[in-house]
From Swiss-Prot:
PROSITE patterns reported for this sequence: G_TR_1, G_TR_2
Protein name from the UniProt record: Elongation factor G
Swiss-Prot/TrEMBL keywords: Cytoplasm, Elongation factor, GTP-binding, Nucleotide-binding, Protein biosynthesis
Compartment(s) of residence: Cytoplasm
Length: 702
């Protein structure tokens, strides 16, 4: 079956934003206008198509990134827009991170009242990391306190972006009724709230001067990004709308400019123009650089590694990245993947090059939020899902078995909060372990482990809401009732001075003995650098087949910690000497010797505990400012800055996670429910000595 839509007519985009900026509502409207749903779903009614999990419909927030395909016609040409709706709540950053990795462009939705919020900054940084071109949509222009100008200014100041304003709002708050297109200099007026009666008219006379000024600024901005246009502009030539749009498209894809549009998605205003902008300014898969990878077993960036390049074309060998695993209630396990090159038909075998295993693509689906369409073939640049993968997980590469390639995987942040959980009945016991392992397969930032000393099951995640949703899903989807402990902070251990340590593991009991002997130099690394292992053995004093066992022994010992049982981080270990025994040495013996070595070194290295510090932003009415600041101080917080936003005050602070449990509830009661806050993990910091002592004593007593 030939390709239905040419590659240059495909757009893979994500809709990303702060919680409550109106992201899902915007997606709903897009699906409505592209003819994908005949009735609009409302988030506040709990019927939104993209929010198809019960928890999402109850909480009115988006938790999983649903992928959807929508057609759109512009100037008589048919385009296909693949949309990934991502959550804005910080506890679910993993969803944003993994969607951005496979997108070509993004729509960033801002709340016209609040402007750039903390999560908007996080998302913007994530999009920068993956070089994703984007357009901005200033939503909620009909709300009291909305200001388009302020929002544009904040995009400039807070995000360091260059906003290219392509539309101006007509009216604001309850008088918002349309937009001015600065290219055609025509006004689009919405005469009803369904977006059916839309008319193009002349710009209202009183807005004409402002529109002309804004148009000149826009032309100048576009001309500056392209030498040819600059010349024409300086010669005083009038640039055509086509030239300007072409220039803006190029500047957007090169990430020099960010087009800004406005509207009110809930009132169906501005969404059709947003779809036009997606097609006009955001890249097709062909506009993005070719994808690169390595041969299986090699690491990108190492010396002498051969870099393999795949062009975006149906004729190249099949290459795709799995970016999400979902347990679907009807068809079982689904793996969403993005095809970067080549094509594949259902029933074919592919190689999972990350794990070195074959996978059969039994059924291929194209997803529409929660309804699915079976397809026979999937082509370069498309997003699809395979049913029942045996060996594939998030971040894995699947490719043509005859042309293996491994793409760079997706890196996820480490969990910062943990909680004990136990089944209520014996019958729940087995169901719970199945449920937890399935949920951990879906979500790489959710971890499950058993505490060796207490035998408790511990779950770890990115925040209180994250773990709450996991427990909730366990109850609903897997019918497991469980008791939860209080959330606990996931501390870390590290050393503060270099240590030279020698350890020998020798065991002589009749028959074959055990012998491993290592000398390792341990040094502290700067915060956030993780673990670095250096093999400095010369002359084969330890044979090279035992070196990986030494590294593994160190890594395993680091996981279980030394002074209080927390993972050891920010450490460099240089293996420089040791010895072996012809008969008695084994991988096991060297693993144990390395583990003993690490434990002793940490004890001698003036160890300290590190605690996670959260970046908190609280928006409060002026009269509660003192209360909010006092509260931060009582939580060992460090105020970073206070600024006015409209008639509210925004307080930014760094606060230890240990002191933030239940913060939202306390804040609501202290401010009569009028203040809001958002927080995200920022970094680890040394714990004050008295507190560290208390924790170590408590842990050793247990």
């Amino acid at each position: 079956m030939p390709r239905q839509i040419e590659l240059d007519k495909v757009r893979n985009i994500g809709i990303i934003a702060h919680i409550d900026a109106g992201k899902t509502t915007t997606t709903e409207r897009i699906l409505f206008y592209t003819g994908r749903t005949y009735k609009i779903g409302e988030v506040h009614e709990g019927t939104a198509t993209m929010d198809w999990m019960p928890q999402e419909q109850e909480r009115g927030i988006t938790i999983t990134a649903a992928a959807t395909t929508a057609p759109w016609r512009l100037n008589g040409v048919e385009y296909r827009i693949n949309i990934i709706d991502t959550p804005g709540h910080v506890d679910f950053t993993v969803e944003v991170e993994r969607s951005l990795r496979v997108l070509d462009g993004g729509i960033v939705v801002f709340d016209g009242v609040a402007g750039v919020e903390p999560q908007s900054e996080t998302v913007w940084r994530q999009a920068d990391k993956y070089n994703v071109p984007r357009i901005c949509f200033v939503n909620k222009m009909d709300r009291v306190g909305a200001s388009f100008e302020r929002c544009v200014q904040m995009i400039k100041d807070r995000l360091g972006a260059k906003p290219a304003v392509v539309q101006l709002p007509i009216g604001v708050e309850d008088t918002f009724r349309g937009t001015i297109d600065l290219f055609t200099m025509k006004a689009t007026i919405y005469y009803d709230d369904l977006g059916k009666d839309i008319r193009e008219e002349e710009i209202p006379a009183e807005l004409r001067p402002a529109a002309e000024k804004a148009r000149n600024e826009l032309i100048e901005m576009i001309a500056e990004t392209d030498d040819e246009l600059t010349l024409l502009y300086l010669e005083g030539q009038e640039l055509t709308v086509e030239e300007l749009k072409r220039g803006l498209r190029k500047a957007t894809i090169e990430r020099k400019l960010v087009p800004v549009l406005c509207g009110a998605a809930l009132r169906n205003k501005g969404v059709q123009k947003l779809l036009d902008a997606v097609v006009e300014y955001l890249p097709s898969p062909l506009d993005r650089p070719a994808i690169t990878g390595t041969l299986p077993g090699q690491v990108m960036g190492d010396e002498g590694v051969e870099v393999i390049t795949r062009r975006v074309s149906d004729d190249e060998p099949f290459t795709a990245l799995v970016f999400k695993i979902v347990a679907d209630p009807y068809v079982g396990k689904l793996a969403y993947f993005r095809v970067y090159a080549g094509k594949i038909t259902k029933g074919s075998y592919v190689l999972n090059s990350t794990r070195g295993q074959r996978e059969r693509l039994g059924r291929l689906l194209r997803m529409h939020a929660n309804h699915r369409e079976d397809i026979d073939e999937v082509y370069a640049g498309e997003i699809a899902a395979m049913v029942g993968p045996k060996n594939s997980y998030t971040g894995d590469t699947i490719c043509d078995p005859d042309h293996p390639i491994v793409l760079e995987s997706i890196r996820f942040p480490e969990p910062v909060i943990e909680m004990a959980i136990e089944p209520k009945t014996k019958a729940d016991q087995d169901k719970m372990s199945i449920a937890l392992s399935r949920l951990a397969e879906e979500d790489p930032t959710f971890r499950v482990y058993t505490d060796q000393e207490t035998g408790q099951t511990i779950i770890k995640g990115m925040g209180e809401l994250h773990l709450e949703v996991i427990v909730d899903r366990m109850r609903r989807e897997y019918k497991v009732e469980a008791n939860q402990g209080k959330p606990q902070v996931s501390y870390r251990e590290t050393i503060t001075v270099p240590v030279d340590q020698e350890s020998r593991f020798v065991r002589q009991t009749g028959g074959k003995g055990q012998y491993g002997h290592v000398k390792i130099k341990f040094e502290p690394l700067p915060p956030g650098k993780g673990f670095e292992f250096v093999n400095a053995i010369v002359g084969g004093v330890i044979p090279k087949e035992y070196i990986p066992a030494v590294e593994q022994g160190l890594r395993e010992a680091m996981q279980t910690g030394v002074i209080a049982g927390y993972p050891v981080v920010d450490l460099k270990a240089t293996l420089y000497d040791g010895s072996y025994h012809e008969v008695d040495s084994s991988e096991m013996a060297f693993k144990i010797a390395a583990s003993m070595c690490l434990k002793e070194a940490v004890r001698r290295g003036k160890p300290q505990l590190l605690e996670p510090i959260m970046k908190v932003e609280t928006v409060t009415p002026e009269e509660f400012l003192g209360t909010v600041i006092g509260d931060f101080n009582s939580r060992r917080g460090r105020i970073e800055g206070i600024e006015a936003r409209g008639n509210a005050q925004v307080v930014r602070a760094f606060v230890p996670l240990a002191n933030m449990f239940g913060y939202m509830t306390d804040l609501r009661s202290a401010t009569q429910g009028r203040a809001t806050a958002s927080m995200e993990f920022d970094h680890y910091e040394p714990l004050p000595e008295a507190l560290a002592k208390e924790i170590i004593e408590k842990r050793s007593a247990n």
